[in-house]
Every structure is written in structure tokens, then in C-alpha cells.
Curated annotation (Swiss-Prot):
InterPro entries cross-referenced by the UniProt entry: SAICAR_synt/ADE2_N, SAICAR_synt_PurC, SAICAR_synth, SAICAR_synthetase, SAICAR_synthetase_CS
Family under the similarity heading: Belongs to the SAICAR synthetase family.
Annotated protein name in UniProt: Phosphoribosylaminoimidazole-succinocarboxamide synthase
Native organism: Idiomarina loihiensis (strain ATCC BAA-735 / DSM 15497 / L2-TR)
Reaction catalysed by this enzyme: 5-amino-1-(5-phospho-D-ribosyl)imidazole-4-carboxylate + L-aspartate + ATP = (2S)-2-[5-amino-1-(5-phospho-beta-D-ribosyl)imidazole-4-carboxamido]succinate + ADP + phosphate + 2 H(+)
Top-level EC class as recorded in UniProt: ligase
SUPFAM superfamilies the UniProt entry points to: SAICAR synthase-like
Coiled-coil annotated residue ranges, if any: none
GO cellular component, one term: cytosol
Highest taxon, organism lineage: Bacteria
Entry's EC annotation: 6.3.2.6
The UniProt record lists the keyword Nucleotide-binding: yes
One Pfam short name: SAICAR_synt
GO molecular function, one term: ATP binding
Length: 237
């Protein structure tokens, strides 16, 4: 497998073509951003931590029967992935009230949600990722009704698997976002699962161990990511 030209450069990852038209290289960079790119910093080792963390989580999900784009980890900061036809919506599940849900609905942060809530958001930085519903998604041709149901099914299956995994490590999976795409006609989990795209709290102290440390200026971002990885048994060094 040969890495070739850059296909896309996002806020924290770069995607490269390879000599296989069905495979891409996903590079995790040290760039860290928040508020649709308004706040950006470089954090040492973050790319390495997120790449290894993502490989660990995706492998656990594959073991649970959830198809993902991940093929293999190539280096400290790069992974080989399938080239998915991405669906331009984010699937968000919330187990505990935090973030935009608190701001939108005026509920107390930390309130446990039973059942968990599910929301769709359009991936569009210029519009600040607006919330959309199933009717929007079908009307604008972003996904079919069948694909929507499959994304919801897989998103909740991820919740079952990861809530238990994190709970065993003394962590509370507050919320997370997932992105899906199509490969050979099958819906698969794409993008990443790292502390950049979920909220994780210490189950006892409620200490935040995710990107909210960056958003809220709490410091110790990579240290928190390392702590989560250590509790899960992710080998970093």
C-alpha cells in the first residue's frame, strides 16, 4: 500500500489517497479546534493518542459485530481505512445532559437521560452543524429511510457496547457523535471515535476527561486523553 496525494484536510485529520482506489490513509494530527475552528491549538502527542485510541475502540466495535471503516493501524499517527461514500449527517446519542442540549433546553448539566436521546445534525461548519430530522435527510437525498434506520440501529448498538466498556474503566459515557458511510452497499461506521468526539467523565468525581477541557480552558487535554486510554488498557508508548 502506497500513500499518495492529499484528498482532504480537516480540522484535526488529513485524508490521503493510496494506490488502492478503495482505501485511504487517515492521519491524526496534533491540531485541536473548537467552536467551528475559531479556537485552534497544537497539542503535543494528541495525534498519536487519538490514532491509537481510535484503533482500540473501532476494534472493540468490530468484535461486537459493528462494521467500521478501519483496516489497520499503520503508524503512531496513521491508519488504513476503507473509502466510504460518507453520509453528511452526524448521529448524536446523549446518556447524560451536557453541552448544547443544556443550552438549548435549559436542563441541568449532569441529568441522566433515560432513555438516551438521539439527534441528527447536518455536517456543515458554515451553518454551525444545524439539527435536522429524518424528513430533512430524506427530502434532500442525504440518506434513504432504510439507511437512516440502520444508522440509528448501529448508533444505539455502539452505545450498548461502549457504555459497558467505559463503565468497567470507571468512566461515564456522557454523549458522542458518529458518522456513517456506504462501502459496497453496506452502512459502516466511519470517521473516528476519540475523546475529540465524545464526552467522558470520571464516574465518581464527574471530572471531565474529553475535549471540553480544551473548549472550557481547563488545561491538561492530552493528559486527560492519556488517562482514559490507560484505564481502558490502550497501549500508547
Amino acid at each position: 500500500m502506497e500513500k499518495r496525494s492529499e484528498l482532504y484536510r480537516g480540522k484535526a485529520k488529513t485524508v490521503y489517497h493510496t494506490d488502492d482506489p478503495n482505501r485511504l490513509v487517515l492521519e491524526f494530527r496534533n491540531d485541536t479546534s473548537a467552536f467551528d475552528g475559531e479556537k485552534v491549538e497544537q497539542l503535543d502527542d494528541k495525534g498519536m493518542v487519538n490514532n491509537k485510541f481510535n484503533h482500540f475502540i473501532m476494534s472493540k466495535l468490530e468484535e461486537a459485530g459493528i462494521p467500521t471503516q478501519l483496516d489497520e493501524r499503520l503508524s503512531d499517527t496513521e491508519s488504513l481505512v476503507k473509502k466510504l461514500d460518507m453520509i453528511p449527517v452526524e448521529c448524536v446519542v446523549r446518556n447524560v445532559a451536557a453541552g448544547s442540549l443544556v443550552r438549548r433546553l435549559g436542563v441541568e448539566e449532569g441529568k441522566e437521560l433515560n432513555p438516551p436521546t438521539f439527534e441528527f445534525f447536518l455536517k456543515n461548519d458554515a451553518l454551525h452543524d444545524p439539527m435536522v430530522n429524518e424528513y430533512h435527510i430524506q427530502a434532500f437525498g442525504w440518506a434513504t429511510a432504510e439507511q437512516i434506520e440502520k444508522m440509528k440501529e448501529l448508533t444505539f448498538k455502539v452505545n450498548d457496547v461502549l457504555k459497558a466498556l467505559f463503565a468497567d474503566a470507571g468512566l461515564l459515557l456522557v454523549d458522542y457523535k458518529l458518522e456513517f458511510g456506504v462501502f459496497d452497499g453496506e452502512i459502516m461506521l466511519g470517521d473516528e471515535f476519540t475523546p475529540d468526539g465524545c464526552r467522558l467523565w470520571d464516574a465518581e468525581t464527574r471530572e471531565k476527561l474529553d475535549k471540553d477541557r480544551f473548549r472550557q480552558g481547563l488545561g491538561g487535554v492530552v493528559e486527560a486523553y492519556r488517562e482514559v486510554a490507560k484505564r481502558l488498557g490502550v497501549t500508547l508508548d
